[in-house]
């Protein structure tokens, strides 16, 4: 497809006319153009298009201001909230095992300190003690009734009643209760209505045997008999005195688990009003619904219509929510729980309302007692002390529910068939909760209805709505999950996994996802209750959406994460087959499956067989590796998860206590392991740090199991020169073997195995030899020549001599060589974390690295500091494999080389800079680690680096999943403000009349760069200029305030070399892209891309991502002229240099998506990506040619021409301002600037002879008709697009008019008439226009 055809849809709405690219009818000319070395080579070109614009429409603004955003996912946000450890779990659950009821009533005899009114309260446990004769009968009935009232709250406890006891009776009762309860709680209930009030010392009263005396009982004795844990209920006057006595006892000793409930304060007596029962406190604690309704009825307008006796006959059962009595109890529980939740500290709420069922019931009822008894001038007291709750507004909701209930009572008894009408209480409270969800947040008061939501979950009628609302709440963040778990939803959602209701499955999976994202310890409960079966069935269901099945896979991954019982249970439930079945099915899906689902299938498998040999064997037998390799997609999360699963499929060695010969691995398993390592090596240079991290972790596992032989392979390169000559290929041989272009993504092309090469056995395993060695894998390998056989024999003998006795298990030498090369590649990774991991992997096989301090550069790129003198200085390794592939990587071998070189041999031999290999003796103090050839040990295994993909992926489910649009409103508003600013200034730039730039800079910045400014850029929306020097020092300067905002080093490697700076996502929180080209070593250079956030804030810069961008280079490439440009509209980064292609990186996918080859012996020296036409790119070459590419066309190349007369490299290249897709400005080092219309490329339509040679920089304004060129002869010239010279800049504004240095870089502000110029000196100058006249 031609260029014009591809651009029609994009530009059809603008004033630019675009037609198909058929300028020539001469097919021969067109056909031969691609290989023509003449001045002009054309593939296609459209007719001339108009480039006049009257205004910027909304459509054209889309081209000028692309909406594409990259690198803004969770993986790039290191500033995620630190999740605090969950606090919801109780330290321990308690149970009340025994209840002691002590009744001191002595009916018919009033205590001496009580003066009763008439009439007065008489009922005890709703029985009139004077209604029976003899009094003992009434006493027994009251005791029995109290026991029954308590049994409604806790039926399984043991109840013991003592009626009018003596002190010895109480002692025996207490001792027997403690003996029975053991470590469980004991409840001691004391009714002292028939004895005097407690003494000031806190003594309660009992009787002597003849009831002739009151005997004091100190609470200290009571406490010594009952011990702890206990709960006391004192229903007597002045009961707080007893609490004070307990408090004094606790203050003198360690704190005890002791809870006390007292009926009234120190100077208060129990109410005697006839509207209350005599034991009003006990009635509130044990029969709350009855007394609450009677108390409310007397204060309600319904009292004239309701017979109070009907309350005693309310139909239904207390534990049946579908009856009137059951619903009232349900509402009462919800109300009191809500009051407690909203007024108590969380820890106290959990202790009193969630730790013990009986204690929770008593404290709910205690809140009612406070409300009712305060109306009788009594204040119930508790320990721990509770704040006042009698006026809480939730009591109004209870009163309303009670009133609705009472209003129905007469009809129930008039017509027994009357249908029960449920209360609207829960519906209304759920609506209130929903309103909070619409407007609440973490920073507002928590929803008070949360305990009510828990209560609703217990019943089917509102369960679905409650679960949906609960899911919305949990989605607000980990704080919400912790809050919900603290209120007590956990047992309920565990129990709901036993339901088979289909409509609840999806929301339950969502809720469990949120719970496990906060607290993985729930895995134990899920396995114990067989909850994993529920989620495996859901995962295997066909009616669930992929996103929901991804959540199920996440839940199962958490269940098996580090929990052996979970792994065993899921393996028994056939989880491997379920996951692999989905992976197989997704390979045939069109459209592609949900990436999150694929990601968590891989992570679930990886966690299932991590350090679990039985699962690893089953995974290998099921060909899991093939499915995982096929799962490598364009999405980096899936790639990283697949690499993680492949890595954990590798067995790292034996568990402690297992012998060397416990297990055998057959040839098929060897082949699987071989396939896994090859697939890992294929992605060792992946564009995503997340993927490369997993590769490093997986290689560490592989190295741990094969460290003896990996170390031997590395040692083979540490031989004296006479050994190297026989075991290493020459440099010429290496380059002649077809490896002149090194493709790191295909590690197989790096080395070659001889057909006769001997396989090396894996450490610690016994297996038969592989009869057919792998071939075609190692090209240029040090073991690939005729001496490879001898080298292998030496390796095997070395293994035996070091005490590892085993029969050889075949593993191709190529794998070991490629793996060691991959480890060195990772140790030089642009990401500091991955480089550190790479060094740790090397340490596993016995190689330590010495961090070399970079020496001060003298300003001449390519010079490296000489290494410090060592005993091995001068060893010849010019043809060493390390030199060819590792670059300047300081190393140390932690074990001696195979053949230590002699001192005489080392004299006078050449050294390789920055690379130090130092032999360490076994067990030497500075070796740092145990020798890797020793047996597998826990201490060594603990050194293996840990994966990050799993924990990082779990963070996804901690974030809001159901919405989040509101959170982006502020970002959208800022973007719109920037967009408006941009469009206004674009219009000004396009329609301005520019007379030139002032020779006097508006700002002069001394960067203090020792090597001069290499590149600079101007921030589009802030008065900021960013500059960098050859040593990759980056500095950010505010030119309005003349202040340095930040300065940092791009990397810590000794080899430096900056190439370019670009801004990514400039309409949002922009990122700084830094392209650096390190000094090469013999065969390859490192061209690294690093992208920084918060680069303008001092000390806050953070590396978002980093990768090596050039995947292949020419033989002998210096790598110093690598070029890069960024295209926001497509999200593509274009990179080239001394290679045979232009690399196209998708930054959002962090993946190399295309490689555009060019048939030329010249290197690319300039790149310019169109900022208004996505996927379009112009490239300038070292021979002066210019080519136009479009990544959407099959052949990429659209047009090629050679506009410059002299064969000099293209220094600068840019598309002209505006929407025209074919007009380009090209500047040659010879000094001429050519204006091209690539639709008519036979000749340039305008030429400017700007400089007589030595043109060094070109700047083209993105929107204004102005360009600037710089020269090594210390001047800058400014031109219009018509070729008119608008000005010359020669001098800095300073005393004596100091001349500027040789110009190294020029950068225009994208939306203002502002030019930044950097020179070989340390100054960066900013120039603006004389005046701008807008058209009227």
Curated annotation (Swiss-Prot):
WD repeats lie at residues 1008-1047, 1053-1102, 1116-1155, 1159-1199, 1205-1246, 1250-1289, 1298-1336. It holds the Pfam family Raptor_N. One of its GO terms (biological process) is maintenance of shoot apical meristem identity. Residues 746-757 have a biased composition (Polar residues). Keywords: Repeat, WD repeat. This is Regulatory-associated protein of TOR 2. Probable component of the plant TOR kinase pathway. Belongs to the WD repeat RAPTOR family. Gene3D superfamilies: Leucine-rich Repeat Variant, YVTN repeat-like/Quinoprotein amine dehydrogenase. Residues 746-766 are annotated as: Disordered. Expressed at low levels in roots, leaves, flowers and seeds. The keyword Repeat applies. InterPro entries: ARM-like, ARM-type_fold, Raptor, Raptor_N, WD40/YVTN_repeat-like_dom_sf, WD40_repeat_dom_sf, WD40_rpt. GO terms for cellular component: Cul4-RING E3 ubiquitin ligase complex; TORC1 complex. Disruption phenotype: No visible phenotype under normal growth condition. PANTHER family: REGULATORY-ASSOCIATED PROTEIN OF MTOR.
């Amino acid at each position: 497809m031609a260029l014009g055809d591809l651009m029609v849809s994009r530009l059809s709405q603008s004033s630019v006319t675009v037609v198909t690219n058929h300028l020539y009818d001469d097919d021969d000319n067109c056909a031969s153009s691609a290989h023509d070395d003449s001045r002009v080579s054309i593939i296609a070109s459209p007719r001339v298009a108009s480039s006049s614009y009257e205004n910027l429409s909304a459509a054209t603004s889309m081209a000028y201001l692309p909406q594409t955003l990259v690198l803004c996912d969770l993986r790039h946000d290191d500033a995620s909230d630190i999740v605090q450890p969950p606090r919801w779990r109780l330290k321990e659950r308690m149970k009340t095992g025994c209840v002691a009821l002590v009744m001191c009533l002595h009916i018919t005899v009033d205590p001496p300190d009580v003066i009763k009114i008439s009439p007065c309260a008489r009922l005890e446990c709703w029985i009139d003690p004077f209604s029976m004769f003899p009094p003992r009968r009434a006493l027994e009935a009251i005791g029995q009734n109290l026991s029954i009232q308590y049994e409604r709250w806790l039926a399984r406890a043991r109840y013991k009643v003592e009626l009018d006891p003596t002190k010895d009776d109480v002692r025996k009762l207490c001792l027997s209760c403690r003996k029975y309860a053991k470590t469980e709680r004991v409840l001691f209930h004391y009714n002292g209505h028939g004895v005097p009030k407690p003494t000031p010392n806190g003594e309660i009263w009992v009787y002597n045997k003849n009831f002739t005396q009151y005997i004091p009982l100190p609470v200290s004795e009571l406490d010594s008999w009952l011990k702890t844990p206990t709960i006391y209920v004192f229903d007597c006057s002045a009961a707080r005195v007893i609490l004070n006595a307990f408090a004094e006892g606790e203050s003198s000793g360690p704190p005890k688990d002791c809870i006390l409930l007292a009926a009234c304060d120190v100077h208060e007596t129990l109410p005697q009003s006839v509207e209350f029962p005599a034991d009003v406190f006990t009635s509130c604690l044990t029969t709350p619904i009855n007394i609450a309704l009677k108390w409310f009825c007397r204060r309600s307008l319904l009292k004239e219509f309701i017979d109070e006796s009907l309350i005693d006959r309310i139909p239904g059962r207390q534990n049946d929510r579908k009856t009137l009595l059951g619903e009232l109890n349900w509402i009462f529980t919800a109300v009191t729980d809500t009051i407690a939740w909203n007024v108590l500290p969380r820890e106290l709420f959990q202790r009193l309302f969630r730790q013990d069922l009986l204690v929770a019931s008593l404290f709910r009822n205690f809140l009612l007692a406070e409300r009712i008894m305060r109306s009788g001038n009594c204040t119930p007291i508790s320990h721990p002390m509770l704040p006042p709750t009698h006026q809480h507004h939730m009591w109004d909701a209870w009163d309303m529910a009670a009133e609705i209930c009472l209003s129905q009572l007469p009809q129930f008894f008039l017509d027994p068939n009357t249908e029960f009408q449920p209360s609207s209480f829960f519906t209304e409270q759920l609506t209130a909760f929903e309103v909070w969800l619409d407007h609440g947040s973490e920073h507002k008061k928590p929803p008070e209805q949360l305990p009510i939501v828990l209560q609703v979950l217990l019943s089917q009628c509102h369960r679905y709505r409650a679960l949906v609302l609960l899911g919305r709440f949990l989605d607000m963040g980990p704080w919400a999950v912790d809050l919900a778990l603290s209120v007590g939803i956990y047992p309920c959602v565990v129990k709901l996994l036993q339901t088979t209701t289909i409509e609840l499955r999806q929301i339950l999976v969502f809720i469990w996802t949120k719970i496990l994202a906060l607290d993985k310890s729930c895995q134990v409960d899920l396995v114990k209750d067989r909850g994993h079966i529920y989620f495996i069935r859901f995962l295997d269901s066909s009616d669930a959406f992929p996103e929901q099945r991804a959540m199920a896979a996440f839940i199962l991954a958490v269940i098996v994460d580090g929990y052996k019982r979970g792994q065993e249970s899921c393996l028994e439930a056939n989880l491997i087959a379920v996951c692999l079945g989905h992976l197989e099915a997704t390979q045939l899906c069109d459209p592609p499956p949900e990436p999150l689902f694929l990601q968590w299938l891989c992570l679930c498998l990886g966690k299932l067989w991590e350090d679990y040999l039985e699962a690893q064997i089953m995974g290998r037998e099921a060909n899991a590796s093939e499915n995982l390799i096929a799962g490598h997609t364009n999405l980096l999360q899936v790639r990283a998860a697949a690499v993680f699963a492949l890595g954990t499929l590798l067995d790292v060695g034996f568990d402690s206590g297992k012998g060397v010969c416990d297990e055998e691995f057959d040839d098929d398993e060897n082949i699987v392991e071989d396939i896994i390592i090859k697939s890992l090596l294929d992605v060792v240079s992946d564009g995503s740090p997340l993927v490369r991290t997993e590769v490093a972790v997986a290689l560490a596992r592989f190295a741990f199991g094969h460290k003896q032989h990996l170390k031997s392979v590395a040692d083979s390169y540490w031989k004296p020169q006479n050994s190297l000559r026989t075991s290493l290929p020459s440099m010429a041989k290496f380059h002649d073997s077809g490896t002149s272009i090194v493709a790191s993504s295909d590690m197989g092309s790096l080395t070659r195995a001889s057909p006769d090469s001997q396989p090396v056995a894996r450490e610690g395993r016994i297996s038969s030899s592989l009869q057919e060695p792998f071939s075609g894998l190692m090209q240029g390998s040090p073991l690939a020549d005729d001496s490879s056989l001898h080298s292998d024999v030496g390796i095997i003998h070395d293994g035996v001599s070091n005490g590892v006795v085993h029969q050889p298990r075949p593993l191709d030498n190529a794998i070991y060589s490629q793996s060691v090369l991959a480890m060195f590649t990772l140790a030089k990774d642009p990401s500091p974390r991955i480089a550190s991991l790479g060094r740790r992997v090397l340490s596993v096989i016995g190689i330590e690295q010495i961090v070399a301090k970079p020496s001060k550069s003298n300003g001449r790129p390519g010079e490296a500091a000489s290494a410090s003198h060592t005993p091995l200085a001068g060893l010849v390794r010019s043809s060493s494999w390390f030199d060819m592939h590792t670059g300047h990587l300081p190393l140390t071998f932690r074990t001696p080389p195979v053949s230590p070189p002699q001192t005489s041999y080392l004299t006078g031999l050449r050294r390789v800079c920055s690379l130090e290999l130092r032999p360490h003796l076994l067990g030497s103090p500075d070796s740092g680690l145990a020798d890797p050839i020793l047996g597998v040990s826990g201490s060594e295994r603990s050194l293996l680096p840990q994966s990050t993909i799993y924990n990082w992926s779990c963070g996804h489910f901690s974030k809001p999943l159901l919405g989040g649009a509101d959170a982006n409103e502020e970002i959208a508003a800022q973007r719109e403000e920037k967009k408006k600013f941009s469009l206004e200034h674009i219009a000004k730039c396009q329609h301005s009349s520019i007379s030139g730039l002032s020779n006097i800079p508006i700002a002069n910045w001394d960067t203090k760069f020792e090597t001069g400014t290499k590149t600079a850029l101007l921030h589009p929306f802030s008065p900021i200029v960013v500059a960098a020097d050859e040593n990759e020092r980056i500095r950010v300067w505010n030119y309005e305030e003349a202040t340095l905002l930040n300065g940092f080093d791009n990397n810590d490697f000794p080899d430096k070399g900056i190439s370019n700076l670009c801004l990514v996502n400039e309409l949002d929180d922009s990122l700084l892209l830094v392209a650096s080209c390190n000094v090469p070593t013999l065969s390859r250079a490192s061209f690294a891309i690093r992208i920084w956030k918060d680069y303008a804030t001092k000390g806050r810069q953070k590396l978002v991502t980093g990768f090596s961008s050039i995947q292949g280079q020419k033989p002998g490439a210096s790598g110093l002229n690598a070029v890069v440009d960024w295209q926001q509209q497509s999200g593509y980064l274009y990179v080239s240099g001394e290679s045979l292609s232009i690399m196209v990186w998708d930054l959002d996918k962090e993946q190399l998506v295309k490689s555009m080859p060019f048939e030329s012996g010249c290197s690319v020296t300039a790149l310019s990506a169109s900022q208004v036409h996505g996927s379009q790119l112009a490239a300038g070459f070292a021979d002066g040619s210019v080519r136009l590419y479009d990544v959407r066309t099959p052949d990429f190349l659209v047009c090629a021409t050679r506009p410059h007369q002299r064969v000099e490299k293209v220094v600068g290249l840019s598309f002209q301002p505006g929407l025209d897709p074919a007009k380009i400005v090209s500047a040659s080092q010879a000094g001429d600037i050519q204006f091209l219309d690539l639709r008519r490329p036979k000749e340039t339509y305008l030429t400017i002879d700007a400089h007589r040679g030595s043109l060094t920089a070109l700047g083209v304004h993105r929107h204004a008709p102005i360009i600037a060129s710089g020269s090594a002869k210390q001047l800058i010239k400014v031109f219009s697009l018509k070729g008119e010279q608008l000005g010359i800049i020669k001098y800095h504004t300073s005393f004596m008019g100091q001349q500027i240095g040789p110009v190294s870089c020029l950068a225009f502000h994208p939306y203002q008439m502002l030019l930044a110029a950097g020179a070989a000196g340390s100054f960066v100058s900013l120039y603006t226009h004389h005046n701008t006249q807008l058209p009227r």
